[in-house]
Amino acid sequence: VDSLMNHVVGRSVVELPHKSDLLTNWVSDITLDIIKDLSGYKVDLAIMNKGGIRCAMPAGDITEGLLDSMFPFDNRYMVLEMSGKDLLEALNVMASRGGDALSRGMMVTYDKSGKVLSAKLKGKKIDPKKMYKVATIDYLANGGDYMVPLTRAKRLYEDEQKYGIHVLNYVKELTAAGKQIKSVNEQRMQCK
């Protein structure tokens, strides 16, 4: 078991500090990619929680043990279909705690009280009447971290495996393709 946990499965170009935009963006972006592949749905965005990522990712070698430490919980990936109204409400919950993890294409600004001022997906405002497909984990879909708006969504897909296993496989596939872990340093939830 020790040798398995020390087994190098990938490399990170730079350090992704704990609870940083670099780390949460990487996790949200790969969640979006992985769930699209697993579910076959055209998913619009991914919502994850900073608290579910338990440690930083250092630059250099990434071991199976590190990934297991980063994602120790028994959470499963899900696809939800929800109204823009409920999505905006969920973004308000995220803003009230200083922002959280969103995938590429999402840009949210909020005020000091935690109220969303602007929420855009690929440059277009979130429409309260439109339906959106959202990738997330069962913990959030069940209302964890006060994400009650997600409990009103229709559940389209629920994976059977712990999502950390999918992250491990994603990193292994990246390595097999001769690529390293990279992230985008952008603040997708900004307090104005």
What is the role of each PLM region?
Residues D21, N25-K192:
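Feature captures C-terminal
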Residues V9-H18:
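Short glycine/proline- and acidic residue-enriched helix-loop micro-motifs
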Residues V1-V9, L23:
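Intrinsically disordered, low-complexity terminal and linker regions
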